[in-house]
Amino acid sequence: MTTAIMPGCESFSATNGPLGVLVLHGFSGNPASMRSLAESIADAGYSVELPRLPGHGTTLEDMMTTTWADWSRTAEEAFDSLSERCDRVGVVGLSMGGGLSAHIAEVRPRVSACVLINPIVKPPGEEMIEGLTALLDAGVETIDAIGSDIKKEGAIEASYDATPLECVASLFEAMIDVNANLGTITAPTLLLSSREDHVVTSDNGDDVVSMVKGPVERVWLENSYHVATMDNDLELVESATIEFLDRILKS
């Protein structure tokens, strides 16, 4: 039986011409958090794919059956689909979607531009890994939810009410390779960093700046928390993203 998708959390697709953009949502989130940005990119004339990653936008139990292998495969397939019908393709991602975007730029040389929004691109420190391992060894399956880190009053992210630890472990393990290969990314990259982020530490963005081989532009978001695509700086996120994509993909 197919697991029902939460209302408003469906994938989004738009076909507008020979320039494409893949948009990727974050861990335990869903396309709803990226819908406004994806629609704005489409309105700017781009063909857009915003896939719902496996286990997301459905139920916590559904997510607990998935790993990085499932999420990255879906992202890669969406990029390949865009590449088949577009001359140039960029990737845009929030949080884990930023990590997935970096991963795609590492394994798909056709990536022409990257926009990383509060991305996770490195594993956490030893202390957090030890704590995670201890919880898993003790049979703990979930911890408190990490969604809705949003400064804007009244804004709520549609996400799960708990965080599955096996999925967290899978994400952290994948970040070892993503981080090690940041130096293979040659595509121009726009990094959007919230000054105050309670989910992803700022050293993730610092690694993008110091390790990515191609040119990196960093824009600080002064009035948003982690889910910047639903926060006070949404207008800046959209305008900076589209200006960057126009400058790189249309050149």
Regions found by a protein language model. Name each.
Residues 223-251:
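Catalytic active-site module of serine/aspartate enzymes centered on a nucleophile-bearing elbow/loop
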Residues 59-85, 90:
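Catalytic nucleophile-loop/oxyanion-hole region of alpha/beta-hydrolase
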Residues 37, 187, 201-210:
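Short alpha-helix in the alpha/beta-hydrolase fold that links the catalytic acid
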Residues 3-59:
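Short, surface-exposed "cap/lid" segments of acyl-processing enzymes
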Residues 115-125:
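Active-site nucleophile loop of the alpha/beta-hydrolase fold
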Residues 184-185, 191-193, 197:
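Short beta-strand/loop motif that positions the catalytic acidic residue
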Residues 47, 206-227:
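Catalytic histidine neighborhood in serine/cysteine hydrolases
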Residues 93-97, 101:
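Gly/Ala-rich beta-loop-alpha elbow adjacent to hydrolase catalytic centers
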